[in-house]
Amino acid sequence: MRHDGRRPDELRPLAFRRRYTRPPAGSVLVRMGRTTVLCTCSVELTVPPFLVGTGKGWLTAEYAMLPGSTSPRKPRDRAGKIDGRSVEIQRLIGRSLRAVLELEKLGERTLWIDCDVLEADGGTRTAAINGAYVALIDALTSSSALFPPVGQVVRGSVAAVSVGLLGNEELLDLDYEEDKEAEVDLNLVMTGAGQFIEVQGSGEEATFSRSQLDRLLKLGKLGIDAITAKQRDALGASWPLA
C-alpha cells in the first residue's frame, strides 16, 4: 500500500474541466491528484517562417509553473531567463501532440498550446499532455469554420503517465513524495492505440533490468488506457475517433 492508500497500479484521481476560461478556443483544467494544470489552445492565423507558402500548419507549446505552484516559491520564467526544465517539457508537449496531427489539414495556421501549472505534486508534464489533448480537440471543434472535421485532422489520441521503481516495487503515476525517492523514473507518452510517442527514463543512483523495464512499460500501458478512457468520457460527443 502506498503512502496515499493507492494500489501500485492505481492512478491518482483524474478529472478534466472543459471550457474553464472563455477567450481561448480550447481551455481545460486538469487535475491528477493534487497536481493541477490549466491547458489552453489558441488559434493563430499565421505560421513560422519556415512554413510560409507551404500550405501546412503547425502546433507549438509553452509550459510554465506559476510561482505559487510549489513551496518554496518558484521564480517566474521571464524572457531570456526560461528554466531549462520548462523548455524541455514544452518541447515534449509539442512533439507529443504533433505526432497525431495531420498538419497539412490545418492550412497555414498555428495552434498554440499553453500549459500553466497551478499546483505541482509530481507528474506535471504528464498532466499537461493529458489536458492539452482535450484542449486541442475542443479548439478544433469550436473553430470548425477554419478547419476540416476533427476526425480528418487528428488521427489518434495522446495520453501520458509516469511509472517508477521505489523499494523494488513498480508504481504507476508517482506523486512528488514518491518521485523524489524513486530509484527509477519513466515518463511514457502513447497513443490510445498503444503506439509509443516518447519514453523518457533514467535510474537515480540505481540501475534496472530489461525485465523491470518491460514490466514498467506494461504498467504504464494500463495507465494510458485508463487515462484515454477518462479523456473520451470528458469529451463525450466531441471525441474525434471512431
Predicted regions and their residues:
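Polyanion-binding surfaces on beta-sheet-dominated domains and ring/shell assemblies
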Residues: 1-242
